[in-house]
Amino acid sequence: MRNLKFFAVATAGILAFSSCKKEDDNNVNPGEGNPSNEKGIVSLHFDNVYKKVGNSIKLANDAKSEGTILTSANNQQHKFQTLKYIISDVSLITKDGKEVQYNHGDPNKGAQIINQAESASHHFNIPNIPVGEYSKVKFLLGISEEVFKKGENFQKEFFDKSTKEGMNWKWKNGYRHLRFEGFYGTDFSSAFKLHLGDKVASENANSIPGSIAIELPIKDILKVQKGQTSAIHIKVDLDKYLSGVNKITLSKTNEDIHSVVGADEFVKNIKEGMFSVDHLH
């Protein structure tokens, strides 16, 4: 009889353990160490457009050639010849606030140069994202000051790539986080350059980071599923360059900027409204 009781208790214990184990296996927490097979891929797409109407920006080869003509809120016309920026330190935020980071602090693995002239550069995949629901995407426009301070050898692969793309001023002066160039005026005879970079420290001044932290809500909620690829399309509205929070008129005083110094109005326009999540699929 004692043996029968022991067998019954033992069997109940095994069944209870089996039930708990099965329940635990199905309890996927997107922000915390899911099993490696409970992962998906997120593809980020950056669409450079004018006034969010879905029209891609066509670059002009020179002042006289065709290109998308943008008209600012101050009724000034301009067009882009070069449109490049760096994306790094991407994070996805779950509905309950947990952050999943993608190669933060390592531009060799986690940074991308978006170049309007190269369509293949407009999107990149982020693998091994835990399954779950995500309500925000964050990234850095540029490379952080902390990463730059790690030295050239640490980030040589990406720095060499940025050199080929014209996205740095050689090592001493750091990265061009963003590079907007083009022409403006009634006959487009005037040129503008916005090269957003750090103000590197000198004996008489402190360094000022030029990278910009961007955080975007995902209103429809991104659902990452096991073994599937989910896409986030981020619209980059170039109308905000001159017609964002600040209504800017290009002139001799602001047409040629080569660091974060003097770029306050442009930075505010970029940070507050240029980037938005358009749709998912």
Tell what function each PLM region has:
Residues 11-14:
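Alpha-helical transmembrane segments
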Residues 4, 21-22:
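Low-complexity, intrinsically disordered regulatory segments enriched in Pro/Ser/Thr and acidic residues
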Residues 1-8:
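Bacterial N-terminal signal peptides that target proteins for export
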Residues 22-281:
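A short, solvent-exposed, low-complexity linear motif enriched for acidic/polar residues
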Residues 16-19:
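C-terminal motif of bacterial Sec signal peptides marking the signal peptidase cleavage site
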